[in-house]
């Protein structure tokens, strides 16, 4: 079932009008308190209008968009190369700009689709695109100027002078250059142009065609519809029939301005700039955490329904109370209950799906060499979750758990993810284990896979493990740690943690030496009060304790991938990561070189080596690292699940990890692909028969899980931005240090150093100059009699990539945050002057 066909979330409208004087929630569906004030109205039942699916408007029937060509024509065009197939990406800051990967590969810039050529397609849709004539392509000004200087300025026959050099208008098509400067289409190389395409057919509607937004009156009172304006600018405005809307909206629309509704697009005709749609329901007051969270969940179609009785009844066990591991399981499972097994997780985690143990052994290689046994124990979810059951279908559709700032929307019922499957301390739990025998230098000699029984001794938080690592000589007491079961001591837990830490460091170094890459982008962490409102915000810091767990999860995933690929070469579910887009990573490298930070992105190893140069702990190093990480992440392609059926071995490669086989095995509580991998590994080991699912079915699951994983990530990111916005609205304007990421003629993008948040700063109301070729923006500050002494006169300041500036974060609208550049102080200007010499010597544009 494709995303757009899914019936899961889009439901028949409920109440579509604000009701009562005051609605107060002490904790809404997503846990945040909300108070909504409205004017009194009487509730009325929803009545479906007879003409709801045949909206007519009074617009000129002239076609605004071109009609789609037939599927047969599309298939033929893709086959003969006159068209190509791609996934549409719409610029969230400018819905008139859309992008697709170039059909000739990643060494070419993206194909650009502009304005009406988008032809009613939406974000994420799989579309057929026809390349427009070369004369309609846009000029890539920077590359074009280089070509002009080399090939036209010295051409005596051209008769051109400096006054005839190319126009600097950013969006200028080749046709203009042909007319104005006498060039021909054939002589201008494609590398100087941006390929322009037009969408001719939608092959798959990946976008759900749903949105959250607000209602507006139509400017034409004779029009029988209401305008729905989505919060996501990439979604078109939607015509809603008047019969869907509370009658009182038309007499007092101002009272409805702050309310958020949800709507579903039913059609988008070629003769209308607006889509047709239906109102689904009233969400609540915009700006309230619970309302905005429901908006996020709805827009990304995250299934947050309570699990049905049929789902729960499909479990072999319906209650967790007094549950014990059946005796029959001990007959074939390896028993690790005598080993000191424990978990390391976030402090608030309740779904504990992985545990570790480590111990010294006398023979790690069969030759009497002392070494280590490391056990990675993963919750045996498939013991409870049987293939083909109602719950299995639900889990497959959800694809994964979704983590929001204040809550988790689980993939599985809480009886599994928090009780029966969670590797809680002090109780016997079923697990699926990978056990490694290795030397103290992390040379791997043997891997054992199998079902097992464990008994975790303690639930450590990352903070506890980090305390052990930072204070190895300290004698920890029981009061400093969570409860430890089975008579083990804090000393024993500490020693096992340090043993794991030492070997994890070696494993990590080996991976980095072999070319593994890690790009760490800042992640926000919020301190919440009892009402789930933000009281503080910081960047989540990845420490050695996090890296400890990560290393052993990676190792287990890699070894399991090899095992299932070997046993099921046509059915294995693996995860690959394509290399970055060649042209984009080359452009990023050139950008970084211009600002004095060499970067080599030809391989993951070379890129990793480049990034490790900026791993220092100073404020300057952190700024550089954040900027370069933000730049290098853009050319990266998404890692994806796939079925190995008829795939070449080269397709298996994981660029970031630089390994040939990788999968996800270690989180079956929160990722459905891990469930499939558990079943495949169990079949490879002879525990059960191989699944009857054919490769095409497995690939369909992979595709769906790729989609749900992306939707969950985007929802999680939006939730973080929601909470950040609420925090700024609570605290008021905030002055922050920021680093410039990119410069345009009317604005520039900055990375807020303290929070890792990217904001756009507009300077369109200031006097300014912009040099496109050097990407340098000069701002002219007017005289200010209220400024500090010595800083009152008019002066200019330059904005280039990697400059450090100060901005004010200001509450904007209901929950949004805008950034405004701060007038540089006299001290900052003096520092700037004193660093100019150093900048010239090093080629760096960092301003401290």
UniProtKB/Swiss-Prot annotation:
This is DIS3-like exonuclease 2. One of its GO terms (molecular function) is metal ion binding. Its cofactor is Mg(2+); Mn(2+). It is an enzyme of class 3 (hydrolase). The record marks 353 as: Important for catalytic activity. PROSITE patterns: RIBONUCLEASE_II. It comes from Caenorhabditis elegans. Belongs to the RNR ribonuclease family. DIS3L2 subfamily. Keywords: Cytoplasm, Exonuclease, Hydrolase, Magnesium, Manganese, Metal-binding, Nuclease, RNA-binding. SUPFAM superfamilies: Nucleic acid-binding proteins. GO terms for biological process: miRNA catabolic process; mRNA catabolic process; nuclear-transcribed mRNA catabolic process; polyuridylation-dependent mRNA catabolic process; regulation of cell fate specification; regulation of development, heterochronic. SMART domains: RNB. It holds the Pfam family RNB. 3'-5'-exoribonuclease that specifically recognizes RNAs polyuridylated at their 3' end and mediates their degradation. Component of an exosome-independent RNA degradation pathway that mediates degradation of cytoplasmic mRNAs that have been deadenylated and subsequently uridylated at their 3'. Mg(2+) binds at residues 345, 354. GO terms for cellular component: P-body. Disruption phenotype: RNAi-mediated knockdown in a ced-3 and ain-1 double mutant background reduces the percentage of animals with developmental defects including production of ectopic seam cells.
């Amino acid at each position: 079932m494709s995303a757009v066909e899914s019936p899961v979330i889009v439901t028949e409208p409920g109440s579509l009008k604000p009701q009562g004087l005051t609605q107060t929630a002490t904790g809404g569906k997503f846990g945040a308190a909300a108070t909504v004030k409205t004017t009194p109205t009487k509730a009325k039942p929803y009545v479906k209008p007879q003409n709801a699916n045949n909206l007519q408007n009074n617009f000129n029937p002239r076609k605004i968009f071109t009609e789609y060509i037939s599927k047969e024509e599309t298939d033929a065009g893709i086959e003969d190369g006159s068209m190509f197939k791609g996934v549409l990406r719409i610029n969230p800051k400018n819905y008139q700009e859309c992008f697709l990967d170039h059909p000739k590969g990643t060494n070419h810039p993206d194909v650009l689709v502009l304005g009406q050529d988008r032809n009613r397609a939406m974000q994420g849709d799989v579309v057929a695109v026809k390349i427009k004539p070369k004369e309609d392509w846009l000029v890539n000004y920077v590359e074009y100027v280089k070509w002009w200087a080399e090939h036209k300025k010295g051409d005596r026959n051209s008769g051109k002078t400096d006054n005839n050099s190319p126009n600097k208008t950013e969006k200028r098509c080749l046709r203009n250059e042909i007319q104005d400067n006498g060039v021909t289409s054939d002589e201008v190389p494609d590398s100087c142009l941006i390929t322009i395409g037009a969408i001719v057919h939608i092959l798959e509607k990946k976008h759900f065609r749903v949105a959250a937004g607000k209602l507006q009156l139509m400017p034409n009172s004779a029009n029988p519809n209401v305008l729905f304006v989505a919060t996501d600018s990439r979604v078109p405005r939607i015509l809603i029939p008047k019969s869907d809307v509370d009658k009182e909206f038309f007499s007092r629309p101002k009272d409805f301005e702050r309310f958020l509704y949800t709507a579903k697009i039913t059609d988008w005709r070629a003769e209308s700039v607006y889509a047709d749609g239906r109102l689904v329901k009233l969400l609540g007051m915009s700006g309230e955490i619970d309302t905005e969270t429901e908006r996020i969940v709805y827009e990304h179609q995250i299934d947050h329904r309570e699990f049905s009785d049929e789902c729960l009844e499909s479990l072999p066990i319906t209650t967790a109370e007094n549950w014990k591991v059946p005796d029959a399981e001990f007959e074939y499972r390896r028993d690790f209950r005598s080993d000191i097994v424990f978990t390391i997780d976030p402090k608030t985690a309740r779904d504990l799906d992985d545990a570790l143990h480590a111990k010294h052994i006398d023979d790690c290689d069969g030759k009497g060499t002392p070494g280590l046994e490391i056990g990675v124990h993963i919750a045996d979810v498939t013991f409870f979750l049987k293939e083909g059951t109602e719950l299995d279908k639900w889990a497959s559709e959800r694809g994964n758990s979704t983590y929001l700032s204040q809550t988790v929307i689980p993939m599985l019922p809480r009886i599994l993810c928090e009780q029966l499957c969670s590797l809680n301390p002090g109780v016997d739990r079923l697990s699926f284990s990978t056990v490694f025998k290795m030397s103290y230098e992390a040379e791997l000699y043997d891997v054992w896979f199998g079902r097992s029984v464990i008994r975790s001794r303690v639930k450590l938080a990352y903070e506890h493990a980090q305390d052990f690592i930072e204070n190895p000589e300290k004698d920890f007491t029981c009061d400093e740690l969570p409860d430890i079961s089975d008579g083990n001591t804090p000393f024993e837990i500490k020693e096992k943690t340090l043993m794991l830490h030492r070997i994890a460091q070696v494993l990590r170094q080996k991976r980095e030496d072999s070319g593994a890459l890690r790009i760490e982008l800042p992640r926000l962490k919020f301190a919440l009060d009892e009402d789930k409102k933000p009281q503080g915000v910081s960047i989540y810091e990845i420490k050695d304790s996090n890296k400890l767990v990560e290393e052993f999860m990676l190792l287990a995933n890699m070894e399991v991938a090899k095992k299932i690929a070997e046993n099921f070469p046509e059915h294995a579910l693996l995860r690959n990561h394509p290399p970055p887009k060649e042209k984009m990573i080359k452009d990023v490298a050139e950008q970084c070189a211009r600002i004095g930070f060499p970067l080599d992105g030809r391989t993951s190893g070379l890129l990793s080596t480049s990034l490790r140069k900026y791993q220092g702990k100073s404020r300057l190093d952190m700024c550089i690292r954040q900027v370069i990480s933000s730049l290098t992440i853009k050319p990266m392609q998404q890692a994806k699940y796939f079925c190995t059926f008829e795939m070449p071995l080269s397709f298996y490669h994981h660029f970031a990890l630089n390994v040939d086989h990788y999968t996800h095995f270690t989180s079956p509580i929160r990722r459905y692909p891990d469930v499939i991998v558990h079943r495949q590994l169990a079949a490879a080991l002879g525990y059960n028969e191989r699944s009857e699912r054919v490769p095409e079915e497995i690939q369909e699951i992979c595709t769906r899980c790729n989609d749900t994983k992306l939707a969950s990530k985007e929802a999680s990111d939006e939730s973080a931005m929601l909470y950040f916005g609420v925090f700024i609205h609570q605290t008021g304007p905030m002055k922050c240090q920021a680093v410039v990421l990119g410069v345009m003629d009317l604005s520039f993008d900055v990375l807020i150093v303290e929070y890792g948040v990217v904001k756009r700063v507009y300077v369109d109301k200031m006097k300014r100059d912009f040099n496109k070729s050097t990407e340098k923006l000069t701002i002219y500050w007017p005289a200010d009699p209220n400024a500090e002494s010595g800083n009152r006169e008019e002066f200019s300041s330059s904005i280039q990539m990697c400059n450090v500036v100060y901005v004010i974060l200001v509450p904007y609208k209901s929950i949004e945050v805008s950034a405004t550049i701060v007038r540089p102080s006299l001290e900052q200007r003096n520092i700037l002057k004193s660093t100019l010499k150093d900048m010239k010597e090093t080629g760096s544009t960092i301003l401290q």
